[in-house]
Design a protein with these regions (language model features):
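Charged phosphate-binding loop/patch that engages nucleotide di/tri-phosphates or the phosphate backbone
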Residues: 152-176
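A structural signal for short, hydrophobic/glycine-enriched beta-strand patches
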Residues: 1-146, 150
Length: 176
């Protein structure tokens, strides 16, 4: 089985923006009969009361992906959360031959770092499929440095310690 993880992105209106649709289009092209699609994104816009993953699921079904092949991760509020909660879903339940992580190209270096930290050794990742989208307002170098600090001192794949740090030290998740 191949697993395709698609990282969400904040939805500001009643519909997905072009960047998120582009990520999904890349994932849909990767999909085959041996694939499962894990759509990752929680409720980041409380005006909508729907998770990013639910919006993505609707788009995938409308574009031919069978509902039975879709897994939802609806707790994450950022990329670190994407990695943590996807790892929690996959560990012990799925044994994918390869895990494709799909996001925007500018976002892939950080995504790769975070997912390898959360999943640890024993998983084969492919980070080569991304949606080319220019976001000049995004400071990825700063975001990567914040991710490095978050994971500092934690062993790769130690999901219990990573999850504990997430809920005790990450401002988006404290107290959950």
């Amino acid at each position: 089985m191949e697993l395709i993880i698609v990282l969400g992105s904040r939805i500001n209106g009643n519909d997905m923006h072009d960047e998120l649709k582009g990520r999904l289009d890349v994932a849909i092209k990767l999909f085959n009969g041996n694939s499962r699609m894990l759509l990752s994104g929680g409720i980041t816009n409380h005006d909508l009361n729907r998770s990013e993953a639910q919006f993505m699921k609707d788009y995938c079904i409308a574009n031919g992906i069978p509902e039975a092949s879709i897994i939802l991760e609806e707790k994450s509020l950022d990329t670190i959360g994407n990695g943590v909660f996807c790892a929690m879903i996959v560990h012990g339940k799925y044994l994918p031959e390869v895990i494709y992580v799909v996001s925007s190209c500018y976002h892939m270096e950080r995504s790769e770092f975070i997912f390898e930290k959360c999943f640890g050794p024993g998983y084969r990742f492919d980070f080569s499929h991304c949606f080319s989208f220019n976001r000049p307002d995004i400071n990825e170098k700063e975001s990567i440095e914040l991710a490095r600090r978050f994971f500092s001192g934690l062993l790769d794949g130690d999901i219990d310690s990573i999850k504990e740090r997430l809920f005790n030290m990450h401002n988006l998740y404290i107290g959950q």
